[in-house]
Amino acid sequence: MARGGDTGCTGPSETSASGAAAIALPGLEGPATDAQCQTLPLTVLKSRSPSPRSLPPALSCPPPQPAMLEHLSSLPTQMDYKGQKLAEQMFQGIILFSAIVGFIYGYVAEQFGWTVYIVMAGFAFSCLLTLPPWPIYRRHPLKWLPVQESSTDDKKPGERKIKRHAKNN
Protein backbone atom coordinates (compact mmCIF):
# COMPACT_ATOMS: atom_id res chain seq x y z
CA MET A 1 0.00 0.00 0.00
CA ALA A 2 1.49 3.31 -1.04
CA ARG A 3 1.85 6.09 1.48
CA GLY A 4 2.82 9.79 1.59
CA GLY A 5 5.60 10.00 -0.99
CA ASP A 6 3.93 7.83 -3.62
CA THR A 7 4.13 9.28 -7.11
CA GLY A 8 1.09 7.51 -8.52
CA CYS A 9 -2.58 8.27 -8.14
CA THR A 10 -4.16 7.11 -4.95
CA GLY A 11 -6.88 4.53 -5.23
CA PRO A 12 -9.94 4.14 -3.00
CA SER A 13 -8.17 1.81 -0.55
CA GLU A 14 -5.10 3.99 -0.02
CA THR A 15 -4.41 6.60 2.61
CA SER A 16 -2.13 9.59 2.72
CA ALA A 17 0.81 10.01 5.09
CA SER A 18 -1.45 11.82 7.56
CA GLY A 19 -3.86 8.88 7.60
CA ALA A 20 -6.65 10.62 5.70
CA ALA A 21 -8.47 8.29 3.36
CA ALA A 22 -8.53 9.01 -0.35
CA ILE A 23 -11.84 9.80 -2.03
CA ALA A 24 -13.41 6.76 -3.68
CA LEU A 25 -14.97 7.50 -7.05
CA PRO A 26 -17.59 5.29 -8.67
CA GLY A 27 -16.09 2.94 -11.23
CA LEU A 28 -12.63 2.82 -9.64
CA GLU A 29 -11.61 -0.35 -7.89
CA GLY A 30 -8.12 -0.95 -6.58
CA PRO A 31 -5.14 1.27 -7.27
CA ALA A 32 -5.48 3.69 -10.17
CA THR A 33 -3.69 2.84 -13.39
CA ASP A 34 -2.04 5.25 -15.82
CA ALA A 35 -5.16 5.27 -18.02
CA GLN A 36 -7.30 6.10 -14.99
CA CYS A 37 -4.86 8.84 -13.98
CA GLN A 38 -5.41 10.48 -17.34
CA THR A 39 -9.22 10.28 -17.21
CA LEU A 40 -9.64 10.84 -13.47
CA PRO A 41 -9.51 14.68 -13.55
CA LEU A 42 -12.13 14.75 -16.31
CA THR A 43 -14.43 12.48 -14.31
CA VAL A 44 -14.08 14.64 -11.21
CA LEU A 45 -14.58 17.88 -13.13
CA LYS A 46 -17.72 16.55 -14.85
CA SER A 47 -19.18 15.37 -11.54
CA ARG A 48 -18.77 18.80 -9.85
CA SER A 49 -19.72 22.28 -10.78
CA PRO A 50 -16.82 24.17 -12.36
CA SER A 51 -14.73 26.04 -9.82
CA PRO A 52 -11.35 27.78 -9.96
CA ARG A 53 -9.95 25.35 -7.40
CA SER A 54 -7.59 22.66 -8.61
CA LEU A 55 -7.92 19.00 -7.81
CA PRO A 56 -7.07 17.90 -4.28
CA PRO A 57 -3.64 16.29 -3.92
CA ALA A 58 -5.19 12.85 -3.44
CA LEU A 59 -6.66 13.01 -6.95
CA SER A 60 -3.77 14.56 -8.85
CA CYS A 61 -1.42 12.48 -10.97
CA PRO A 62 2.28 13.10 -11.48
CA PRO A 63 3.17 14.92 -14.69
CA PRO A 64 4.68 12.72 -17.39
CA GLN A 65 8.48 12.77 -17.58
CA PRO A 66 9.48 14.95 -20.56
CA ALA A 67 11.54 13.18 -23.19
CA MET A 68 14.17 15.93 -23.15
CA LEU A 69 14.97 15.31 -19.48
CA GLU A 70 15.48 11.61 -20.21
CA HIS A 71 17.92 12.55 -22.98
CA LEU A 72 19.79 14.99 -20.75
CA SER A 73 20.17 12.43 -17.96
CA SER A 74 22.09 10.13 -20.34
CA LEU A 75 24.81 12.75 -20.99
CA PRO A 76 28.10 12.26 -19.14
CA THR A 77 28.64 14.80 -16.39
CA GLN A 78 32.05 13.86 -15.02
CA MET A 79 35.20 15.84 -15.66
CA ASP A 80 38.74 14.68 -14.85
CA TYR A 81 41.23 16.70 -12.82
CA LYS A 82 43.24 17.89 -15.81
CA GLY A 83 40.00 18.88 -17.51
CA GLN A 84 38.97 20.88 -14.46
CA LYS A 85 42.32 22.66 -14.49
CA LEU A 86 41.98 23.40 -18.21
CA ALA A 87 38.42 24.68 -17.76
CA GLU A 88 39.50 26.97 -14.91
CA GLN A 89 42.43 28.35 -16.93
CA MET A 90 40.19 28.96 -19.95
CA PHE A 91 37.56 30.64 -17.79
CA GLN A 92 40.08 32.99 -16.19
CA GLY A 93 41.82 33.70 -19.50
CA ILE A 94 38.62 34.58 -21.35
CA ILE A 95 37.38 36.80 -18.50
CA LEU A 96 40.76 38.57 -18.29
CA PHE A 97 40.95 39.05 -22.07
CA SER A 98 37.40 40.42 -22.27
CA ALA A 99 38.06 42.74 -19.31
CA ILE A 100 41.19 44.17 -20.97
CA VAL A 101 39.48 44.56 -24.36
CA GLY A 102 36.38 46.04 -22.73
CA PHE A 103 38.41 48.50 -20.68
CA ILE A 104 40.43 49.67 -23.69
CA TYR A 105 37.38 50.00 -25.94
CA GLY A 106 35.37 51.73 -23.22
CA TYR A 107 38.26 54.12 -22.55
CA VAL A 108 38.70 54.98 -26.23
CA ALA A 109 34.95 55.35 -26.86
CA GLU A 110 34.48 57.06 -23.49
CA GLN A 111 31.53 54.78 -22.81
CA PHE A 112 31.63 52.72 -19.61
CA GLY A 113 28.55 50.81 -20.77
CA TRP A 114 30.52 49.19 -23.59
CA THR A 115 33.08 47.97 -21.06
CA VAL A 116 30.33 46.30 -19.09
CA TYR A 117 28.77 44.77 -22.22
CA ILE A 118 32.08 43.35 -23.44
CA VAL A 119 32.89 41.85 -20.02
CA MET A 120 29.39 40.35 -19.81
CA ALA A 121 29.78 38.86 -23.30
CA GLY A 122 33.15 37.40 -22.28
CA PHE A 123 31.59 35.93 -19.17
CA ALA A 124 28.76 34.34 -21.17
CA PHE A 125 31.24 32.96 -23.72
CA SER A 126 33.48 31.53 -21.00
CA CYS A 127 30.48 29.92 -19.30
CA LEU A 128 29.45 28.34 -22.60
CA LEU A 129 32.94 26.92 -23.06
CA THR A 130 33.69 25.77 -19.53
CA LEU A 131 30.48 24.78 -17.74
CA PRO A 132 29.25 21.89 -19.94
CA PRO A 133 31.41 18.76 -19.64
CA TRP A 134 32.76 18.86 -23.18
CA PRO A 135 34.84 15.84 -24.32
CA ILE A 136 38.01 17.97 -24.19
CA TYR A 137 37.67 17.91 -20.38
CA ARG A 138 37.42 14.10 -20.22
CA ARG A 139 40.61 13.06 -22.01
CA HIS A 140 42.41 11.80 -18.89
CA PRO A 141 40.04 9.50 -16.98
CA LEU A 142 40.97 8.40 -13.49
CA LYS A 143 42.47 4.96 -13.08
CA TRP A 144 40.90 3.44 -10.02
CA LEU A 145 42.76 0.88 -7.95
CA PRO A 146 41.22 -2.59 -7.86
CA VAL A 147 39.28 -3.55 -4.76
CA GLN A 148 41.50 -5.38 -2.28
CA GLU A 149 40.42 -7.77 0.41
CA SER A 150 40.85 -6.27 3.85
CA SER A 151 43.60 -8.07 5.74
CA THR A 152 42.78 -6.52 9.12
CA ASP A 153 40.60 -9.53 10.01
CA ASP A 154 43.64 -11.83 9.99
CA LYS A 155 45.60 -9.82 12.56
CA LYS A 156 44.91 -10.22 16.23
CA PRO A 157 44.39 -7.10 18.31
CA GLY A 158 47.65 -7.70 20.23
CA GLU A 159 49.74 -7.87 17.05
CA ARG A 160 48.98 -4.34 15.94
CA LYS A 161 51.57 -1.72 16.74
CA ILE A 162 50.40 1.27 18.68
CA LYS A 163 51.72 4.46 17.20
CA ARG A 164 52.75 7.04 19.73
CA HIS A 165 53.23 10.62 18.79
CA ALA A 166 55.93 12.78 20.28
CA LYS A 167 54.59 15.26 22.77
CA ASN A 168 55.00 18.89 21.87
CA ASN A 169 56.14 20.93 24.84
Curated annotation (Swiss-Prot):
Annotated region ((Microbial infection) Interaction with HCV NS2 and HCV E2), positions in chain: 110-169
Record topological domains on the Lumenal side: 115
Subcellular location: Endoplasmic reticulum membrane
Keywords per UniProt: Endoplasmic reticulum, Membrane, Phosphoprotein, Transmembrane, Transmembrane helix
Annotated stretches, region: Disordered: 148-169
Cytoplasmic side: 1-93, 137-169
Post-translational modification: May be phosphorylated.
Keyword Endoplasmic reticulum: yes
GO biological process, one term: virion assembly
Tree of life domain: Eukaryota
Membrane topology: Multi-pass membrane protein
GO cellular component: endoplasmic reticulum membrane; signal peptidase complex
Region ((Microbial infection) Interaction with JEV NS2B): 91-169
Transmembrane segments annotated in the record for this chain: 94-114, 116-136
Family as reported in the entry's similarity comment: Belongs to the SPCS1 family.
Quaternary structure (record): Component of the signal peptidase complex paralog A (SPC-A) composed of a catalytic subunit SEC11A and three accessory subunits SPCS1, SPCS2 and SPCS3. Component of the signal peptidase complex paralog C (SPC-C) composed of a catalytic subunit SEC11C and three accessory subunits SPCS1, SPCS2 and SPCS3. Within the complex, interacts with SPCS2 and SPCS3. The complex induces a local thinning of the ER membrane which is used to measure the length of the signal peptide (SP) h-region of protein substrates. This ensures the selectivity of the complex towards h-regions shorter than 18-20 amino acids.
Function of the protein: Component of the signal peptidase complex (SPC) which catalyzes the cleavage of N-terminal signal sequences from nascent proteins as they are translocated into the lumen of the endoplasmic reticulum. Dispensable for SPC enzymatic activity. (Microbial infection) Required for the post-translational processing of proteins involved in virion assembly and secretion from flaviviruses such as West Nile virus (WNV), Japanese encephalitis virus (JEV), Dengue virus type 2 (DENV-2), Yellow Fever virus (YFV), Zika virus (ZIKV) and hepatitis C virus (HCV). Plays a key role in the post-translational processing of flaviviral structural proteins prM, E, and NS1. In HCV, it is involved in virion assembly where it promotes the interaction between HCV virus proteins NS2 and E2.
Name this protein carries in UniProt: Signal peptidase complex subunit 1
Gene name of this polypeptide: SPCS1
